[in-house]
């Protein structure tokens, strides 16, 4: 029950991301993955039952390394981390907000009442991190690293992240959530190639030219297309 978005497809000039298109894609794929819960096949009855009880989804992205390369931003830099944090926050915030919208129509996941207090606490902590606060988190022994807005190349990304989590919390308090979990960053080692990604998952590229070993024997060459 996984889906990944190729971030380079949302890239614009001057280190800009097409936020409206990205948010629309996150909403669309959250709904698609929610529908797929009832269509999926599971390896055991226990896994199937938990999937129906919690309706967990796996929306993610790939090619963050390629995106940063195309923008000329070092992967291991404050700016790179702020961009990645903002994109991750937008994706997860929009996905939970969409989940709350679905819950308004179809009801929350069946185990939500047993977990509502803790889940809303998690959402509030996520919102606080997206807003850039270093402390004030609820029932955490180790505070998360917040989104540092000043390190982003523009205010658009962190502002969108903050708005996404504000909506996720506001709607979730009213309607609950259709899904206990909505996002995950998968390795995308295979589908990333089909999606024309230069880097898979969340990792940077380790070489401009690579050779992938095939299970049936042989190799094929992979060339990073971000760098001309």
Predicted regions and their residues:
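Long, C-terminal-biased catalytic regions of enzyme "large/alpha" subunits
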Residues: 1-228
């Amino acid at each position: 029950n996984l889906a990944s978005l190729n971030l380079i497809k949302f890239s614009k000039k001057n280190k800009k991301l097409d936020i409206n298109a990205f948010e629309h894609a996150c909403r669309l794929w959250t709904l698609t993955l929610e529908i797929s819960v009832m269509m999926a096949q599971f390896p055991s009855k226990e896994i199937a039952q938990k999937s129906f009880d919690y309706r967990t989804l796996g929306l993610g992205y790939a090619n963050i390394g390629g995106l940063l390369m195309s923008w000329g931003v070092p992967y291991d830099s404050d700016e790179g981390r702020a961009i990645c944090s903002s994109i991750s926050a937008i994706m997860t915030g929009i996905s939970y907000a969409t989940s709350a919208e679905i819950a308004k129509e179809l009801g929350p996941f069946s185990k939500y009442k047993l977990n509502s207090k803790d889940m809303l606490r998690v959402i509030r902590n996520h919102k606080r991190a997206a807003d850039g606060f270093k402390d004030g988190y609820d029932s955490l022994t180790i505070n998360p690293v917040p989104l540092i807005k000043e390190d982003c190349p523009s205010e658009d990304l962190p502002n969108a992240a903050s708005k996404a989590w504000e909506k996720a919390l506001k709607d979730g308090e009213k309607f609950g959530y259709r899904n206990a979990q909505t996002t995950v960053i998968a390795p995308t080692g295979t589908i990333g190639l089909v999606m024309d990604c230069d880097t898979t998952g969340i990792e940077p590229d380790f070489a401009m030219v690579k050779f992938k070993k095939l299970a049936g024997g042989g190799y094929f060459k992979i060339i990073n297309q971000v760098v001309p």
